[in-house]
């Protein structure tokens, strides 16, 4: 599959329980939004959405930061079917 650079928002990094709690809270606040958890030793990371441009990501980041103050945007290579 083809990969592209996308802009993602990370809402949590820490313990497995904390990641699960963040995922559940986010799902209730923003249903039908892409949400994934990954493990990068020693942290579980909860990531949401996938945007083509940083500007698109910034618009959503403002909303997400109300409930997830440590949320931030980062670039990631993803498969094109996630966009």
Sequence positions of predicted segments:
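Acidic/polar low-complexity segments and flexible, solvent-exposed patches
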Residues: 1-83
């Amino acid at each position: 599959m083809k990969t592209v650079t996308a802009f993602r928002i990370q809402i949590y990094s820490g313990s497995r329980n904390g990641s699960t709690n963040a995922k559940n809270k986010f799902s209730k606040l923003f249903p039908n939004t892409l949400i994934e958890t990954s493990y990068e030793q020693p942290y579980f990371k909860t990531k949401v959405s996938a945007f083509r441009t940083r500007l698109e990501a910034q618009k959503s980041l403002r909303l997400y930061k109300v409930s997830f103050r440590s949320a931030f945007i980062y670039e990631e290579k993803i498969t094109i079917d996630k966009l």
